[in-house]
Amino acid sequence: MKLCSLQQLVLAVLFIVSNFYLPLAVASPIGWDFAVTLRDKLLFLDNKFKTVSSAAHEFEGISALAFDEAEEVIYFNDQQHQNGSIFSLRRDAAVASHIVEQAVQRIGNGSVSGLAFDPLNRNLFWADMRQSRIYFASVDTLHTEPPKVLVDLSAEGGRPDGVAVDICRRQLYWTNSKINHASVERIGLNGTGRQVIIKENIDMPRGIVIDQQSDRIYWLDDKVGIFFAIESARLDGSDRQLVLEDKHQSPIQLAITDETIYWTDKADKAVWSYPKPANKKLATNATEPVVEPIKLASWKEDVYGIVARTGFYQHLQKDAHCASVVKKVKQRLDNRLNNRTQSRTAVDDRIEELEREHCLNGATYMTKGNFCICQVGFKGARCEISECHNYCVHGTCEISSMGYPKCYCQTDFYGERCEYYKCNNHCLNGGHCTVDRDSGEMSCDCRDNFTGTRCEHNETAHCGSYCQHLKEHPDAFVPAPCMDICEELRLTNATIVREYQSSAFCSDMPSYRQGSLIIVLVVGVVSSLALVAVIVHGFRLIHKPKRPRIKKTFVVRKQARLNSTSDTPLTNRPLATEQCEITIENCCNMNICETPCFDPKLVEQQFSGRDKKSPCVKEDKKILIHNMEDDLLN
């Protein structure tokens, strides 16, 4: 009887061990690094974007995607499903299959555009673009409590698109793609403190993600026309930066890892990547190569959502803002593990031993999710890989306080991973580059006849024009460094390429000659302009039409009548025998001593007391004209 029970125990242990290791080795959920949504399925991809597995083939309108990394659960939506709008997908490692359950029932004619998950309170957030609202609900009480409205944008006509949760600072970020009033906003997870953080120079923002490593947000902006942009800012909207601007794409959602930004493109039905900007760049004189976006994978169907493993358990354990959140999440998972039945058998002890052996380097095994929570500085399905493994190319790697690898480069190298050689393409024309071990400064050892900090000057071509000029004019000025070269060229009877002659000769002309040449040029230009101005003015004077001369004729009588005191030009017209005509210009050019044109009574009285032999003065003409005008008007 005892023998039989012993055999049964051995068989049970072997059966459990085989069923335990097989899922871990073959169907571990850590086997994928990215997940994307096509219209009718989910694809799980490795870090090289090769398809590992697929799921959810029974759906027809999948778009948005969210990932609960603590429980290894994928949340996705289906626009075409009749009853539910959001579903959960969990991988069952024991049977190597996926279990799909309805998470949120459809609310009217809602249309889910973005999904986000909070691992601390286990709340699911989603943006409904059609109803202009942002909802949230607890995944633990979805069957008993309906979803609640966190933000209502219907009154202002908003169009919430992408959503992202800052799990450390307890904030929800979303993009508002309303035309002409687009923005990026945030609000507390408790529904208070709504704030618009980006509203200038933004067209149609789509996906948004939080980078806890750099405390920044990244979002996609589908610009007007053919362009799109990836932009970044601090969590409060300050320090806005343009990460990438490109064209001919239709970006939808994005994800971010330690080093790279990923986004889905509906136009090319592909996933693209671009390096994430470093927080601090080492200042060097070398020019970094221009980086272009890389197309990682493409399909025949439209691609929408994308999520990536961030490993926030490992990386955020020592973060000032995130440490408490990570601790609470781990504590909740540990409590769930400890709530298992207290009745232990030899099989349970053996399983626990296998669990401890499966996760390496002090990692914690999570039974429900069938994965390992690694210690700081390790990664992999079993935490078997050091973060510093092959990370620094030419330097020493250390794990920072945040849990990320950091490189200390050798003197000759720089870059985030010490991948760039300082002397690369620094010295020209075959010069040899060396780096000072103490200061890190670069210097060039140039070949013969080459000078400059980077050996950029060719002395042979530089002095060729002087040598040519010296050949024609033996007394011409030649710089001292060129004398030996000219002598060498004379002995070898060599000629210099003509294209170098003019530029070299002019660039190295003595300073006093250069100054004289500049003065002569300036004086010549000014003189030419003055001559042109004089010629133009002369032509204008010659061809300008003359001003017309105004002529006016007055009819006056030669002698005044006896009763001339009451005569006026209108009541007493002169007779034909008494009148005469004179032009006003001629009248104005005469005075009273000459032939008077008009001799009214007033003028005679003014001149009656004057000596008749006295010479005429200029005032006579003024009085004559004045009285003539008055009498004519009267």
Swiss-Prot record:
N-terminal signal peptide: 1-27
PROSITE patterns assigned: EGF_1, EGF_2, EGF_3, LDLRB
UniProt LDL-receptor class B repeat ranges: 122-169, 170-214, 215-260
Keywords: Cell membrane, Differentiation, Disulfide bond, EGF-like domain, Glycoprotein, Membrane, Oogenesis, Repeat, Signal, Spermatogenesis, Transmembrane, Transmembrane helix
GO annotation (BP), single: triglyceride homeostasis
Domain EGF-like: 350-384, 419-456
Segments on the Cytoplasmic side according to the record's topology features: 537-634
UniProt topological domain (Extracellular) ranges: 28-515
Transmembrane segments: 516-536
Superkingdom per UniProt: Eukaryota
Molecular function in Gene Ontology: Wnt receptor activity; Wnt-protein binding
Family designation: Belongs to the cueball family.
Stated role: Has a role in spermatogenesis and oogenesis.
Protein name: Protein cueball
Organism listed in the record: Drosophila mojavensis
